[in-house]
From Swiss-Prot:
Described purpose of this protein according to its UniProt entry: Removes the pyruvyl group from chorismate, with concomitant aromatization of the ring, to provide 4-hydroxybenzoate (4HB) for the ubiquinone pathway.
EC number(s) on file: 4.1.3.40
Localization per record: Cytoplasm
Chief subcellular location: cytoplasm
BP terms from Gene Ontology: pyruvate biosynthetic process; ubiquinone biosynthetic process
Enzyme class: lyase
Gene that encodes the chain: ubiC
Protein name: Probable chorismate pyruvate-lyase
Length: 187
């Protein structure tokens, strides 16, 4: 896997839309994956023999323009979710500093453990709304996919999910790479 042509953070400024208001959503089955209410990690694990998390980078960063207006600095974690060694999803998580010290979650010690396992195993983290975004074939996400030897012929899609813990909020963005879309069509 060669991702050396880009550097952490890979994310870019994105226009997210409420799933109810998003026009021209992709056709099934990608649409169902984008709108799935449960754990994406669990859903992905059901499609492979070997699931793994490859960390692209993590650290304290300023959020991108419009990404997290209430925060000057957040903990950013960017990973690839791989099924049988093939990257399916690029995930970008933003965690406010105030949540990093919560006893319910060791975000800094996650390593290659999937974040979804942690969030969906804790009652104190409540899944919130899902927003949708589409990415052009010249976006940074498309460049990342191409650096992974995945040909980008069509626009790419992703979702952003809010998770609430007490009065705090964090975001998990999951963008589907071309290999995932192709595999979904065969499921």
């Amino acid at each position: 896997m060669n991702v050396t042509s880009l550097s952490f953070p890979y994310g870019e400024s994105i226009q997210w839309f409420c799933a109810d208001n998003a026009k021209n959503l992709p056709s099934s089955p990608l649409k169902e994956w984008l709108l799935a209410p449960g754990s994406l990690t669990q859903k992905l694990k059901g499609c492979c023999d070997k699931f793994e998390v490859k960390i692209l980078g993590e650290g304290q960063c300023a959020p991108l323009e419009g990404e997290y207006p209430k925060q000057n600095a957040v903990w950013v974690r960017e990973v690839l979710l791989c099924l049988d060694s093939v990257p399916w999803v690029f995930a970008r998580t933003l965690i406010p500093q105030s949540l990093l010290s919560t006893r319910q979650a060791d975000f800094l010690g996650l390593g290659t453990r999937p974040l979804g396992e942690l969030l969906f195993s804790q009652d104190s983290f409540v899944p919130g709304r899902i927003e949708i975004a589409r990415f052009t074939t010249d976006s940074r996400l498309a460049q990342l996919a191409q650096s992974l030897a995945q040909n980008v012929e069509h626009e790419l899609w992703g979702r952003r999910r809010y998770f609430h813990h007490d009065e705090e909020e964090m975001f998990v963005s999951e963008m589907f790479l071309p290999a995932a879309v192709q595999a979904m069509a065969r499921l």
